[in-house]
A protein has these predicted regions:
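Secondary-structure junction motif
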Residues: 142, 148-205, 272-276, 280, ...
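Alpha-helical linker/hinge and terminal dimerization helices associated
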Residues: 14-15, 36-58, 279, 290-293
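Hydrophobic hinge/microswitch elements
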Residues: 100-104, 109-112, 119, 187-247
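A late-sequence structural motif
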Residues: 77, 144, 236-239, 244-292
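A short LG(V/I)-centered, amphipathic sequence patch enriched
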Residues: 12-29
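Short Pro/Gly-enriched coil loops immediately N-terminal to beta-strands
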Residues: 71, 130-144, 153-163, 180, ...
Length: 301
């Protein structure tokens, strides 16, 4: 790669210091080189923001909007928003990427993704700005065949209670979760917010979750739950996308962790384009919130 080597040596000559330590195998970046690379990245970041700004002046007459999310959001949340957006702005191309939290975070960092819809972006991550889309609630899905259900009949949730969200009313009792201490659980894989959250909810009820199987996809796991393998924590909204299944029983949870935020995430400091702003506006979000209160963008109903 002579061309690249020449570029590196030219840069080193201009800055008067080596970028790489060539006495090591493999090559390592010098202190001066690391500073040089960070500075170049900042310059390129500013150039991309400048380019996006001038592209915006032309309005929403072209360009691409890169969206990312977990499989659930790509399957059930994005389609409606994308259809509404493209009806209004058919000249803008939508690029939708499905991935796990690590992949989506990397997409924001390298700017291959403009917006990410997720529940698991860390609140204390200063590199990400988050806009609240809505909140969701977790419930417990249990195979109907499990004997533990016999004594918990009064706590069962009907499909209508879940779809109407009336189960959130204070008068609807949550199941005593400790009754499931000996029940096998199906979980998402470690690193997934649902895995960490479910484990904490069980610990808060005085027991450790007995995991018998780990999966990547919530939709896959519900099919496994319905076949009697184990119980699982799921988002209540998923019930509306499945046909009624007598093999499943659902219960309300009484734990603050059973409620979580769904947010649109943007790389902090990057230029928020007109397409990004308009997409979030169609989702009911104001995209002009101050950095001091990033998760305050949801418009009042």
């Amino acid at each position: 790669q002579p061309a690249l080597s020449n570029m590196v040596r030219k840069a080193e000559k201009e800055m008067g210091a080596p970028i790489f330590d060539r006495s090591t195998i493999p090559l390592t970046v010098t202190k001066e080189g690391a500073y040089y690379i960070r500075t170049v990245e900042k310059i390129l970041f500013l150039e991309r923001n400048l380019e996006r700004y001038f592209q915006d002046i032309a309005g929403l007459q072209g360009g691409t909007l890169a969206l990312g999310g977990a499989s659930y959001f790509c399957s059930f949340v994005y389609p409606d928003l994308i259809a509404r957006f493209q009806t209004k702005y058919p000249q803008v191309t939508i690029d939708l990427t499905e991935g796990n939290t690590r992949e989506l975070k990397a997409g924001l960092e390298n700017e291959s993704l403009d917006l990410v819809l997720e529940t698991a972006m860390e609140k204390d991550d200063t590199s990400i700005k988050r806009y609240l889309f809505r909140k969701e609630n977790l419930i417990l899905a249990v195979p109907e065949s499990f004997p533990v259900n016999r004594k918990l009949q009064p706590y069962r949730l009907s499909r209508q209670e879940i779809l109407s969200k009336s189960f959130l009313k204070p008068e609807v009792e949550a199941v005593p979760l400790k009754e499931f201490k000996d029940v096998p659980f199906i979980t998402m894989k470690p690193g997934n917010d649902m895995y960490k959250r479910g484990a904490k909810i069980c610990r808060n009820s005085g027991f450790t979750m007995k995991t018998v199987m780990m999966v990547d996809q919530v939709l896959t796991s519900l099919n496994i739950v319905s076949n009697g393998v184990g119980a699982m924590f799921v988002r209540s909204d998923i019930v509306q996308w499945r046909p009624e299944d007598p093999r499943l029983v659902y219960y309300k949870l009484d734990d603050p962790l059973s409620e979580r935020e769904i947010t649109f995430s943007v790389k902090r400091g990057r230029y928020v384009t007109a397409a990004m702003r308009e997409f979030m506006r169609l989702a009911g979000i104001r995209s002009d919130d101050p950095d001091t209160d990033p998760v305050a963008g949801r418009q009042k109903e």
